[in-house]
Amino acid sequence: MDKKAALVIVDVQNDFCPGGALAVAEGDQVVAPLNRYIERFAGAGLSIFATRDWHPAKTTHFKAYGGQWPAHCVRGTSGAEFHRALRLGGRATIVSKGMAADADSYSGFDGVDAAGVGLADLLRRAGVTRICVGGLATDYCVKETVLDGRKRGFDVVVLKDSVRGVDLAPGDSARSLEAMIAAGADMLERFDDLVL
C-alpha cells in the first residue's frame, strides 16, 4: 500500500457491542485488532475515518415506527458512543449516517462529517484510492460500505480479523464476504499481513 490508503472503521458503537440494544455477537472483539490498525495508519500518516449510526429518536428504521430494528444508536445517547476501548484519540474524521427520520442508511458512504461533506468526497480530497474497512456488522453496514466503495471506484480491503456479523439467518456473514469478494474487494486475513 501507499499514501493513498485510508482506514475506515464502521460503527464500533456501544449499542452494537455486548450489552447494547442491537448487540452483535462478539462485537467488542473487533476493538483490539482495530486499535492496532489505528496505530499503524496513524503512524504512517494515513487518514482514518470512523462511521457511526446517528439516528433520531423517531425513525422508520426502528420497529416502533415500522422498521426492522429495535431502537439503537440514538444520537446523544451512550449507546451511540464509540466503544470506550476504541482508541480513536482525535485521529479519526467522524462520519455520521442514519440521521434522516424516513430512510435507512447502512453504508458509510451515506454519511457526512460535521461540515456535511460525504465520505466519498472526504476520501477523494485526501487523495485516497484504497480503503481498508473493519467494524460492525459484516452483513449490514460493513458490507454496504464495501460494496459502495467498489461502486465509487475505490480499491477496498476488508480487514477480516476486525469484522463481526449479525447473522439473522445462519451464514449471512459468510455470504456477505462472498458478495464483497465478487464485487472486487480484497480480504486481509490478519494484521500481520498488512503492508503500508
How should each PLM-predicted stretch be described?
Residues 128-144, 158-160:
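Glycine-rich anion-binding loop/nest that anchors nucleotide
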Residues 61-62, 105-108, 144, 169-170:
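Short, well-ordered secondary-structure micro-motifs
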Residues 1-100, 120, 125, 129, ...:
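Active-site acidic carboxylates
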Residues 112-116, 149:
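Long, charged low-complexity segments
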